[in-house]
C-alpha cells in the first residue's frame, strides 16, 4: 500500500515526537548540545530561520545525513546519538526528515511543533538565512 504525505507526517511525528518552540528555546538558552536542522529549500527561507539552525533541504538530506555517502555532511550529522531537532515551515517535512535519518541509525531526533512558523508565532527570534 502506498503511503501519502499525510501518512508519512503522522508516522514521523508518532515515532519521533515533538518539542515545543518554548522547550527548544529553553534548551538553546541553556547551551545544550542540540542541532537544529531546517529542511526547507533555500528559496523558502525568506521568512527567517531559527538562530543557529543548519539548512539541509529535504531533497539533499538523503545523502547529506547518510554516513555511507561521499556527500555526508559531517559537520551537521556528527554522531547517530546527537540530539537533532528538525524544522520546516509547519512541521510536515520535518516529520519526514526525522524518519529518514532514523533509517540511517540516528536515535535522538525530534520535530519542532508547528515548525518555524510556530516558533515565530510565539515571538521567538529569527534571523535572515545566510
Identify what each model region corresponds to:
Residues 1-34, 39-83, 92-130:
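Rhodanese-like catalytic fold shared by cysteine-dependent sulfurtransferases
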Residues 87:
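Short, surface-exposed ligand- or partner-binding patches at beta-edge/loop junctions that are enriched
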Amino acid at each position: 500500500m502506498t503511503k501519502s504525505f499525510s501518512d508519512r507526517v503522522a508516522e514521523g511525528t508518532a515515532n519521533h515526537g515533538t518539542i515545543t518552540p518554548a522547550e527548544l528555546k529553553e534548551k538553546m538558552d541553556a547551551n545544550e548540545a542540540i542541532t537544529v536542522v531546517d529542511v526547507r529549500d533555500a528559496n523558502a527561507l525568506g521568512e527567517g530561520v531559527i538562530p543557529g539552525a543548519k539548512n539541509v533541504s529535504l531533497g539533499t538530506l538523503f545523502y547529506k545525513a547518510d554516513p555511507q555517502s561521499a556527500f555526508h555532511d559531517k559537520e551537521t550529522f556528527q554522531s547517530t546519538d546527537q540530539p537533532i531537532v528538525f524544522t520546516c515551515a509547519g512541521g510536515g517535512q520535518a516529520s519526514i526528515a526525522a524518519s529518514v535519518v532514523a533509517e540511517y541509525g540516528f536515535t535522538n531526533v525530534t520535530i519542532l511543533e508547528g515548525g518555524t512558523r510556530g516558533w515565530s508565532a510565539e515571538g521567538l527570534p529569527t534571523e535572515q538565512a545566510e
